[in-house]
Regions:
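Intrinsically disordered, low-complexity acidic regions enriched in Pro/Ser/Thr
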Residues: 1-141
Length: 141
């Protein structure tokens, strides 16, 4: 599965998409395809006609890191790669929103807990207690 080149927000979609649009996308995508074998996929926004990707994490909510050390706080059980042009105004100035530029079309996917958006790889499966400890530290901060 591939998305076109461009600027994207990589984050839990509930941090970057406003309430009404978020509710519409949940309905249109059957809750971001949480029951699909690949735990998500590429969807097309019915309003902007832009493609975006969403994949469920292995353990649901928590705090997950990519290979570069960026932390992704997750409260909706998934991580997305959403074109900046699709987002009117994100809901939060959260430190968990990663703005990434992709110079050419890139692969997205999920494999045994690893969510991949081009060069961004986010491991969501492993030591569950470690993820929960990171998440609790973030909540307490």
């Amino acid at each position: 599965m591939r998305l076109p080149a461009g600027k994207y927000f990589v984050a839990d979609p509930c941090y970057i998409i406003r309430d009404e649009k978020y509710d519409r996308l949940l309905e249109e995508t059957n809750y971001f395809g949480y029951t699909l074998p690949d735990r998500g996929c590429i969807f097309i926004d019915s309003v902007t006609k832009l493609p975006f990707a969403v994949f469920s994490t292995a353990y649901g909510d928590g705090c997950y890191r990519d290979g570069f050390g960026f932390k992704y706080g997750v409260d909706a059980g998934c991580i997305s790669c959403v074109p900046v042009a699709m987002v009117d105004e994100h809901t939060s100035s959260s430190e968990y929103i990663n703005l990434v530029s992709f110079d050419e079309p890139f692969e997205v996917g999920y494999n045994d807990g690893m969510i991949t958006f081009g060069h961004i790889e986010i491991q969501t499966k492993g030591d569950y207690d470690e993820y929960q400890e990171d998440y609790q530290e973030e909540l307490d901060a």
